[in-house]
Each structure stands twice: as structure tokens, then as C-alpha cells.
């Protein structure tokens, strides 16, 4: 009987601490220090949400840069179905899917180098990746430039401007956010 009271008090204290104080503290600090990230890294244009800087979107038009293929079920880039394809490198289904993607990309990008960047034909671990390497974005430049009736130099310059490099080079590689790049293309068209 003498152990029940301290156990009950400890249970109530820990419940309040871990179920109330800690979540409120972390949420408050997140909103204060990392407001944009804590709210989904939303990208707005004229006050309207265009998407998240973290979640890929399915672009199919020739005048837009396309991101990595999505492994999400049924609907491409569906965040509710996030997950990789879980196909091993030795799986024939992966080989077939990659071959089909390579053929489709070569057909859609006849002026590009026949060596398709690997990230354009393989899914990311989350299936929702919105970033590409600059090389993969530059590979698509001839198609986008032709569809938008822009020079290759203009579109290449946009890719270079949209390239984000990590603060310290050993923390990652340079990336291009496809949503922001496509928004920059639309802004160029509106000028």
C-alpha cells in the first residue's frame, strides 16, 4: 500500500510532463525558431499556396521540369501513401520499370544526352522527393526550352539560379527544387 501512492504520483507527473509540457514546449519552439518548416515549408505565390518545398508534384507537360518518379500508390506524389517501391536492385520488376522509364524519357527528350540520369528513372525512399541534382535538371533543359520557345541558355540560367548548395559541402550535394524552378519558369513567361 505504501508503494501505490508514490507510483501514482510519479505516473501523474510523468503523464503531465511527457503528454503536456514536452509537446507544448517542442511545438512552441518549432513555431518560434522554424516557423516555415514546422508548417510544411509551403511555397506561396501572390498569397496562394502552390505546394510544399518538401513534397514533389507530378508535372507531365513538356514545358515543365519533371521530378523523380513517385512510388506512391495510384496517385503520383500522394503524401498520404508515402513510401519507396521496396524493389531490390536484382528484382526483374525494377529492371522493367526502369527500362520503360528510360524509353519514355528518351522519347520525350530527343535532344538530350541518351544517357538518362539515374534519379529520373528511380524512385526516392519516400516516393515524394521534390529535389533533383543540377545535372538531372540540366538534362531536361532542351525539352523545356523547346516547349516554352526559350533559348537553352535562358533555361540553363534558371536551373543554375535555382540550384541550392549546402552551407558545408560535406553535408550534401547541390539540389534543384523542381517546384521552385517551375514557378520561376512561369514567372519568366509572365514577364
UniProtKB/Swiss-Prot annotation:
TM region positions: 6-26
What membrane topology was assigned to this protein in its record? Single-pass membrane protein
The residues forming the signal peptide are none
GO MF terms, alphabetically ordered: ATP binding; P-type potassium transmembrane transporter activity
Q: Listed GO cellular component terms?
A: plasma membrane
Name the major location: membrane
Xref: InterPro entries: KdpC
Q: Where in the cell is it found?
A: Cell inner membrane
Pfam families from the entry?
KdpC
Per UniProt, the keywords (alphabetical) are: ATP-binding, Cell inner membrane, Cell membrane, Ion transport, Membrane, Nucleotide-binding, Potassium, Potassium transport, Transmembrane, Transmembrane helix, Transport
Q: What is known about what this protein does?
A: Part of the high-affinity ATP-driven potassium transport (or Kdp) system, which catalyzes the hydrolysis of ATP coupled with the electrogenic transport of potassium into the cytoplasm. This subunit acts as a catalytic chaperone that increases the ATP-binding affinity of the ATP-hydrolyzing subunit KdpB by the formation of a transient KdpB/KdpC/ATP ternary complex.
Quaternary state and interactors: The system is composed of three essential subunits: KdpA, KdpB and KdpC.
Q: Which family does it belong to?
A: Belongs to the KdpC family.
Spell out the protein name for this chain. Potassium-transporting ATPase KdpC subunit
Organism of this sequence? Klebsiella pneumoniae (strain 342)
Amino acid at each position: 500500500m505504501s508503494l501505490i501512492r508514490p507510483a501514482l504520483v510519479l505516473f501523474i507527473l510523468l503523464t503531465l510532463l511527457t503528454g503536456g509540457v514536452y509537446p507544448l514546449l517542442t511545438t512552441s519552439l518549432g513555431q518560434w525558431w522554424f516557423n516555415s518548416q514546422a508548417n510544411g515549408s509551403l511555397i506561396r505565390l501572390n498569397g496562394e499556396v502552390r505546394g510544399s518545398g518538401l513534397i514533389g508534384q507530378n508535372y507531365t507537360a513538356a514545358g515543365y521540369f519533371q521530378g523523380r518518379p513517385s512510388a506512391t500508390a495510384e496517385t503520383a506524389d500522394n503524401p498520404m501513401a508515402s513510401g519507396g517501391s521496396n524493389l531490390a536492385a536484382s528484382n526483374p520488376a525494377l529492371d522493367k520499370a526502369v527500362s520503360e522509364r528510360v524509353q519514355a524519357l528518351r522519347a520525350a527528350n530527343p535532344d538530350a544526352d541518351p544517357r538518362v540520369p539515374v534519379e529520373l528513372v528511380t524512385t526516392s525512399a519516400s516516393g515524394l522527393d521534390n529535389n533533383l541534382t543540377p545535372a538531372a535538371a540540366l538534362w531536361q533543359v532542351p525539352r523545356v526550352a523547346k516547349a516554352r520557345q526559350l533559348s537553352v541558355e535562358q533555361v540553363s540560367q534558371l536551373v543554375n539560379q535555382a540550384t541550392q548548395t549546402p552551407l558545408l559541402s560535406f553535408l550534401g550535394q547541390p539540389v534543384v527544387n523542381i517546384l521552385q524552378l517551375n514557378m520561376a519558369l512561369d514567372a519568366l513567361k509572365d514577364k
